[in-house]
Amino acid sequence: MDPHAPQRQRSGQRLRALALAALACALSPAHAAIDAQQLGARYDAAQANLAFRVYSSRATRVEVFLYKNPTGSQEVARLALSKDPATQVWSLSLPTSTIKNTYGITGAVYYGYRAWGPNWPYDAAWTKGSATGFVSDVDNAGNRFNPNKLLLDPYAREISQDPNTATCADGTIYATGAAHRNKDSGLCASKGIALAADATSVGSKPTRALKDEVIYEVHVRGLTRNDDSVPAAERGTYKGAARKAAALAALGVTAVEFLPVQETQNDQNDVDPNSTAGDNYWGYMTLNYFAPDRRYAYDKSAGGPTREWKAMVKAFHDAGIKVYIDVVYNHTGEGGPWSGTDGLSVYNLLSFRGLDNPAYYSLSSDYKYPWDNTGVGGNYNTRHPIAQNLIVDSLAYWRDALGVDGFRFDLASVLGNSCQHGCFNFDKNDSGNALNRIVAELPPRPAAGGAGADLIAEPWAIGGNSYQVGGFPAGWAEWNGLYRDALRKKQNKLGVETVTPGTLATRFAGSNDLYGDDGRKPWHSINFVVAHDGFTLNDLYAYNDKQNNQPWPYGPSDGGEDHNLSWNQGGIVAEQRKAARTGLALLMLSAGVPMITGGDEALRTQFGNNNTYNLDSAANWLYWSRSALEADHETYTKRLIAFRKAHPALRPANFYSASDTNGNVMEQLRWFKPDGAQADSAYFNGADNHALAWRIDGSEFGDSASAIYVAYNGWSGAVDFKLPWPGTGKQWYRVTDTATWNEGPNAVALPGSETLIGGENTVYGMQARSLLLLIAK
């Protein structure tokens, strides 16, 4: 398990340790084309008919309930669906004239399903809130049908509201078990909304190669919730986020990666805006994989979130910025067994579980319990063809209809599971797993750019063989946790953790050991120092330990990683800022794709809280006012990004060569010891060596700089570096030095204003724990 894997603690759920023998699982049948079953509620082209289609192989009866209003009123129609035994799809088509004239629905059509099955057979005498027909909460086949629970359509394009809101605060109505199974959830349950086709433009998608991206990870609500430049009513919304496209483009960001925006349980955050009770800010508990989260919309009318999302995407596209979204297909918002129960009977039935539990969830070998590699209730059954259909269909919808350019997959190792029930086994060579199906049906963007999706994995989960940094199949980029750890250890744990120069060199050059053995490239390494789950960049260098038990608004937060590889630089604030500059510079000068977290450009702090999943507050909202020091760091970040974008030698399509490939007597990449000699294997492997430099031949990449030189002093004292040959007739010029004496608005020199340092054999003295960047000209 990755020592920095997300620690997500949720009330009402628990991690159930299952130690069952591995069970061989049959391969899935051949999968269908994208959206082949046309599931969901869909109007025909003339909007004369509305068809409802839902999958369940185990249900014995399915009914659709139609509503005029999202909550607080009874259904206006209850209609049985018919099953196609060949596809296991239940369907019903209604003329829109009937919906209007017979059922009196003149506005949006809200709907939900109720399902019966072997553990609760249909009985015509059943009424809402009754036990008529009940046999058991779960049977030996894993069925958990309960007609008292109105179920959200897994393919709904929008949903009415979350299950729990200010007016529907009783979460027990969704539960099974003796105390709750007869409670009817219809008045409060989330309902699907039938939407007609929408023509809102998403603009022209950028087609840049992944290697050229600079990724900015941010929460769509947190981006503007605290921004006075955005109209008050638009703060924290898609519409508000659209207003920041120009600012992010000016920073140099090329791709914005939003934390989950698929509908999640977060309406409860508004019940008590100054409390963490029941709050879910990050959004990693997905209720529906097609619907943009309604809470983030300024326009909350039916269809409003979809239109507003698309308009926001267009704003980013118009600014040349790709839009990525963080997706959570390893588990769902239904969670697992209720805390404090026997783990068998009491579960939430919101959608998937009540329609076809064994199809949508990986279960224990006796089908009674969830199999959990996620820590939040149980694995989504990513090896089942129907569950895979939903993954691929929803991804295609976000890509094609909603304009998304790429996806970051949370705990993506679960999508490499090669079995369904009673076991977990990551197998990248299993052609039928979800990872390989996604690549086959949603082709990744070509290496040189063009049409396609950028696919990024968080390559770990919990337990088993789920830690897979470097282990994903072709087509997948990965969050490189080993890059993060190497930098943190070297910067913050000198004398405690061993990181050799060879390890650093491998990470700085694109991690050939991880991605070069299977045909992948340096740009399949998504490099990062911090992410949303953990310390901010500022806090990584300002705190020795997490500070999660703070009063509102910066806490309290449970969980959180204890092994952070952080250090407060001896409490010296100037050294903390220097460390942040150095870490950011190493990130921007490494081969691979850099990712920063929203606010790190201005030294945003969470005051040491490293698990702010439950804080819908100023702890997570970006602040846009700047002190002089914050403004300096933002300028520093902006200029570093600009330098990276201006120099293709830093963004190689292939791993660097140690040879001279263009005949100018300079190797494409050469590593140096501080004394100017070439670093050899003995130096690379020396645990007591803490300084390293490298030179890239820019001419081999068509770079405007004939050579680029980077020196990193990871030692606790000053070190002199002897500069190498800059090329015939060239001298070295300083772009930046992260030393404390160079802090300020011009810490990174603008093109043409670099400082002359000298030629070959010039000696340059470097402060402890600092970085030097030179170009030859």
Swiss-Prot record:
Binds 1 Ca(2+) ion per subunit. The keyword Chaperone does not apply. Keywords: Calcium, Disulfide bond, Glycosidase, Hydrolase, Metal-binding, Signal. It comes from the Bacteria. InterPro entries: GlgX_Isoamylase_N_E_set, Glyco_hydro_13_cat_dom, Glyco_hydro_13_N, Glyco_hydro_b, Glycoside_hydrolase_SF, Ig-like_fold, Ig_E-set, Isoamylase_C. It is an enzyme of class 3 (hydrolase). One of its GO terms (molecular function) is metal ion binding. The active site is at D410 (nucleophile), E458 (proton donor). The record marks D533 as: Transition state stabilizer. Disulfide bonds join C419-C423. Pfam families: Alpha-amylase, CBM_48, Isoamylase_C. SMART domains: Aamy. Its cofactor is Ca(2+). Its EC number is 3.2.1.68. Ca(2+) binds at D162, E263, T264, N266, D293. GO terms for biological process: carbohydrate metabolic process. It catalyses: Hydrolysis of (1->6)-alpha-D-glucosidic branch linkages in glycogen, amylopectin and their beta-limit dextrins. Residues 1-32 form the signal peptide. Monomer. Belongs to the glycosyl hydrolase 13 family. Has a high rate of hydrolysis for glycogen. Does not cleave pullulan. This is Isoamylase. The lineage of its organism: Bacteria, Pseudomonadati, Bacteroidota, Flavobacteriia, Flavobacteriales. The gene is iam.
